[in-house]
Amino acid sequence: MEEVDRILIHSLRSCGTEVPEDIQSIRQFNTELIVEAVVRCLRVINPSLGATLSHVLPPGMSAQFRIGTSLAQACQDLGYSSEVGYQTFLYSSEPDIRALLIFLAEKLPRDSSEDAHQPAGKSALLQREIVATIKQQLSLPWLPLSCRIAALRRSQSSCRLHRFHSQPLSLASDPALKSIPNERKEYWQRYLPSVTSQLPHLPSVAASLLERNTSKLSAVQEWEAEWKSQGLASRLSPEDYRSKKQQRLQKRIQEQLRQCAQLLAENHLPSSSSQDLTDMLRAFNLDGGSDQKKGSRFTRTQRFTYQQDPHTLKEQMQRAAEILPKKDAQDADAEQQEISSLQEQIDSIEQEIRGLSESNKLLQLTIGQVEGEVNDMHQSCEEKANVVRVKKRAVELLPDADNNLDKLQTLVDASAQRMANLIGQWESHQARLSDEYMELNRVQQEQEDESSRWMKDAKDLYEKIQGSADEAKRKEELYKQLLSEYESLPKEVSRAAYTQRILEIVSNIKKQKEEITKILSDTKELQKEINNLTGKVDRTFVVTDELVFKDAKKDEPVRKAYKYLAALHENCSQLIQTIEDTGTILREIRDLEEQIETETTKKTLSNLQKILEDYRAIKQENAQLLARTREA
């Protein structure tokens, strides 16, 4: 029990219970220490349950009874099945308190906050450091600004707080990837600014990095989930699956843009929106290049000129504004007038461009209608030409109609004969091809089944690989966490002493098991020998009784001997029964001695004295209350 008590005391100290160093056993716990230990454990196990309980025993007896009842109810709510009440805490016994503390110690969360089977690695250590820092800061009293020292000004001031505002960042990818162009790698190495230089405000660096990291992690998780659910079933490589997905997405965007363009055209909305959609459709290659194929050389040259000059003028204006140095006020006014005139020219040119684009659209619609009419006319001309060709052939055959009919009949008969031969050949080929088709279909089905089985095996293998990777990652984090905890432990503790103590305990347990096994085997042998002797005595008495009884009918001395034999057997039976009763009494005596020792450990006399003292204290409190009531 000493080792158990030491482990319990260590667990109670880790929960915050102030157990004195001189206490080494549960037997030395008093009522105040028991109440504090139970309340501390309840607060760690269930903070909402232990928050309403005080770990300090109040002086009044009624308050002590109430807190004892509350503690008993809290332990029962946690699932403690043994009998517990206020007397367990106020008039405690060593076995009951030890059983209750063992139950609470088993309910404590491992590592005081986490389960050892769910390590969190660096994140757990970071959270612990954050919690420790926050607790340390909360433990400091709040002081006015004029009374704070430098450290308190930094910790209790709100000037270092900033809003979580993230901005997009440009970061370099892995340079080992082959798909990245060399120009981009050179840009990353020479010209890409640092993260702190990309943002206008330094406090937004952490928020931007966290946002980018979170978006990357979520994208990776979404891709893994999609690849497990749909990618493996498509039997495509990851690159092909991504390209197919991109094509499907592009087609959907194209259909949506086409529908929006049609709605704008049907509702006669402003031309600017329709023009924007048309340009976007051209970017997706939806217009089929009709605008580029149609139109004269003059219209294409004019469109190019009027669409390019305004941008060129704007770029030239921006360059001129950047290159020209600052001049005096008169030169600035002249430049401003020139810029305004150029802006007016640009506006007029843009207006002309919009008018020309509208006229171009009308011309394109007209050209489309004319092309449709031309195609219809070409189709009708081809149909009429076919009819004329047939009629011309018939007119050429009319002069020699009889011979032509005979020739035609001969051709028909030959065609019929050839058709019959072809049908026979086709039937033979059809049977052979049908067999080949059935065989190929069977082979294909087997291959599909084999492919499905391989796909299922690949998916299971992929899941096993993922599970192994997760398990390896979890074990690596657990290793790092245990290593950090080991490094944080005090180095003066001798590991060899604990190991030697554990080995001694194991050897003692082994010796006890050997002794118990030896005692059990001796008991079995003794019981077997007693049973053999009892059976032998019974058999001997039966045989002797039969032999003596036969001679007792004829001889008087033998009759006396038979009576003595019966009396001897009865006395031996009484002696054996007396021995058995003596053994039973001895066992009962040992049980009673153990019960006496158990009752002695329960401190019955001291508890009775304490109960009497509490009873007198309650009577005194009641008398004081009655006196106050009468005075009131």
From Swiss-Prot:
Residues 243-269, 326-367, 400-540, 584-628 form a coiled coil. InterPro entries: CCDC22, CCDC22_CC, CCDC22_N. The keyword Acetylation does not apply. One of its GO terms (cellular component) is endosome. Disulfide bonds: none annotated. One of its GO terms (biological process) is positive regulation of ubiquitin-dependent protein catabolic process. It comes from the Eukaryota. GO terms for molecular function: cullin family protein binding. Keywords: Coiled coil, Cytoplasm, Cytoskeleton, Endosome, Protein transport, Transport, Ubl conjugation pathway. It is found in: Endosome; Cytoplasm, Cytoskeleton, Microtubule organizing center, Centrosome. Belongs to the CCDC22 family. May be involved in regulation of NF-kappa-B signaling. May be involved in copper-dependent atp7a trafficking between the trans-Golgi network and vesicles in the cell periphery. This is Coiled-coil domain-containing protein 22.
